Amino acid sequence: MGYLVKLACGLLLPLATADVNLAQQPFGEFEWQPKFDTPSGDHTSCAVSRLSAYEVGEGPVSFSLSPTEHPEIPKLSTINSTVWEQWEFDAVSESGTGSVLMGFSRDPSYSFFGQGNLRVEFYMTLEDGTRIQELEYTESSTVIDCPDSIRGIWNSSDRSYAFEISRDMQRARVWWDTGREKGSIAIESTTTPHLADGEIWPPEEGESRVKKSWPSVKLSPGLYMSQPIAGGKVTAHVQIGKKTMSITGYGAHSRLWAENSWFKICRGWQIMRGFLGPYTISYWRPLSRLDDWVPYFAAHLFKHGRLVFTSQVGAPSQQVDYTQFHSDFSGNVSGSLADKATGRVLEFVSPSTGKTWRFHHRHFAKMFEMGFGGGRGLTGFLDEIVGGEVGTDEEFTGRGFSEQVLLPDEIKQWQIWVVYGIGFLGRWKNTVTNLVLSIW
C-alpha cells in the first residue's frame, strides 16, 4: 500500500479523505514521467468510483445521458452484463510515422475469457515501422473525481496504467508501466470540449441549452460520446525493452459509453481525425445494427481552435449543414481486408454560409489490422491530409489517422477470442494471432 500513498499523494495529488485502496503494482520512481504543474485546490472532497475485475451489478444500473454532467466522470454507477464505458487517448507524430492509441475500459462484453471486465487496449506504431497491439486485463479500476482534475488508475500486480485530465479539459496525461513497456503521453488541448452533436461544454456564457428529443451525447442508437479534447499538441515518450521513442505531434481524447457491446449496437464504423494548418477534424460514422444498416454522423471542424462547423447529417441539404464522405482508390496503402480504399475525401458543407471545406485523407501507413473472416474486420491507418476551404487559396497539409470497420452479421465467441482475447496469450499473442488469421 506504500506505493499507493506515493501515487495518490505525489503523482496524483493528495486525497485527504478519499478512501482509495489500490494495493497493486507500485509505479516506482517513473523517471520517464514528464513533470507538470498541477493547480492547487481543496482535495478533501474527491468522489471515488472503484471496480474490481469481476465485479458486476445485478439488474439495471444508472446510465447517464445528461448534457450538463461533467464529460469525464463515470457515466455508469457500475457495470452489469451489457453496459460499458471507455476513456480513449491517441497521438500521431508530426512525421506521421509514429502513433499511440490507448483505451481504458470498464466493459463486460468479453467476460467469457475469464479475465474480468477491466482492460486497456494499446496500439502503437514506432518510427521504424514496428507495430504493437496489446490487450491487457487488470485487477482493479479506480476513477477519482476531484475539484481540479479527474484521475483514473487501471492496476494489477505486475502492470499499471493511469490518466489525469484537468477539470477544464485543457490538459491530459497518461502513464503506463508493464515491466517490458513504459511510457507517457501529454496532451495540451487547442480545441473546445463538446458533445456528440457539437454542443460546446459547458455552454458559453449567456447561452441556453436547446431542448432536444435526441440527447446531445447520443452518437447512434445505444452509443454515446463526448470529446473533451478533439485536438491538441502532444508529446509522448515510450520505452519498449531497449527501444525508445519520443513523439512530438498531435492528439486527442474521447469518452464513449454504450448500452451493449460494439457487436450488438454497430455493424461497423468510420472514424477520422486530422490536424493540418489551423484545422482540427473529427468525424465519426457508426453504422447501426439496432437501426438496421442506417449510418449516423458526428462531424466537427475547428479552425484556430474555434468550432466552425458541426453536423449530424450525412446527405445533401439546402437547409442544414451536412457532410459528404467518399472513398478514394488512387493511393498506394490499403488494408488487406475487403475494403481496399487508399483514403477518403471528406467535405463539410454549410448552405447557410455558402462555405465548403474539403479534406483528402491519404493512407500513409497501417496502424493495426484484425480480421474476422470473409473480408470483414478492423483496420487503422496513419494518414497524410491535404485540404482547406474550397474557393480560397487554402491548401494545408498535415497528419491524422482513420479507422475502417465492418463487423460480421454473426460472430462466434472463439472468433472474438482470436481478435479481442489476444491479451489472454500474453507476450505470444501477436505471433499466435497472425498464425491463426493467416490460415483462417
From Swiss-Prot:
Signal among keywords: yes
Origin: domain of life: Eukaryota
Catalytic activity entry: (5S)-5-(2-methylpropyl)-3-[(2E,6R,8E,10E,12E)-6,8,10,12-tetramethyltetradeca-2,8,10,12-tetraenoyl]-2,5-dihydro-1H-pyrrol-2-one = (5S)-3-[(1S,2R,4aR,6R,8aS)-2-(but-2-en-2-yl)-3,4a,6-trimethyl-1,2,4a,5,6,7,8,8a-octahydronaphthalene-1-carbonyl]-5-(2-methylpropyl)-2,5-dihydro-1H-pyrrol-2-one; (5Z)-5-(2-methylpropylidene)-3-[(2E,6R,8E,10E,12E)-6,8,10,12-tetramethyltetradeca-2,8,10,12-tetraenoyl]-2,5-dihydro-1H-pyrrol-2-one = myceliothermophin E
EC numbers: 5.5.1.-
Known function: Diels-Alderase; part of the gene cluster that mediates the biosynthesis of myceliothermophins, mycotoxins that contain a trans-fused decalin ring system connected to a conjugated 3-pyrrolin-2-one moiety and that have potential anti-tumor properties. The polyketide synthase module (PKS) of the PKS-NRPS mycA is responsible for the synthesis of the octaketide backbone. The downstream nonribosomal peptide synthetase (NRPS) module then amidates the carboxyl end of the octaketide with a leucine.
Family statement: Belongs to the Diels-Alderase family.
Protein name stated in the entry: Diels-Alderase mycB
Organism for this UniProt entry: Thermothelomyces thermophilus (strain ATCC 42464 / BCRC 31852 / DSM 1799)
